[in-house]
Amino acid sequence: MRYPAIDLADAVVLVTGGARGIGLATGEAFAAAGATVCLGDLDGALAVEAATSLGGYGGGVDVTDRDSFASFAGAVRDRYGRIDVLVNNAGVMPLGGFLDEADTISRTTLEVNVWGPIHGMRLVLPEMIARGRGHVVNICSMAGKLPIPGMAVYNASKFAAVGLTAAVRRECDRTGVSVSAVLPSAVRTGLASGVPLGRGLPTVDPEAVARAVVRSCRTRRAEIPVPGYLAGWDLIAAVTPEPLLRLGRRLVGDDRGLTQLDPAARAPYEDRVAAQAAARKQT
């Protein structure tokens, strides 16, 4: 399907989780293309600082809270009149054994990684559809295609996000609005702190993911793996005999989130997620 073109030099882009990592890199990439960048993040002060450096708008947003998301999206509309591109990037990735993970952490993972995109799309898609143009990018993960030991609930959240994106894309057929899933492999950000990367595990920098997000505004592809050579890997896995697949996974070390984790290096990130979970439990 052909979609109305989005002129990035005149576009208003909203990025959640925009204060660091993939979100910040995405904001920088859109700003370099001439777009007006609006960064929302649970750390509102950091989002304001980052957005100001890009000549845009920043503020606090809790993507699990529809009212908070609506308030930030409304502030963007009040300031710029519309939202042309929404990037649902905010996410959390706790690591550890499934049976060891606290329910509060599991709920937070699902609320951020699944309900965040749900809230974002329900708040922004109606205005895009009314205008007959717009683009939504959900930052999913290759973990939404392939199960990985040590991140069972994160896996579940990303499988859900991939399916959600595909279904909403179909519902938006013939509206002029596109919905894409970007599926990074391991990314060198705080989410992966304490995990040994590389050594057979496809690993990219956040800037590579950001470039894929910006390109999606032109290509409007349904799914964009990063790196690109991972396209179709889920289909290969589906037809590979399980013993051979298990051997390959073991050689790559797909369980390194369980067996090779550096607890001290990982602790600051896990503590931040735990604090978010505790705060939500009190509300």
Language model regions located:
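Active-site loop immediately N-terminal to the catalytic Tyr-X3-Lys motif
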Residues: L99, I148-A152
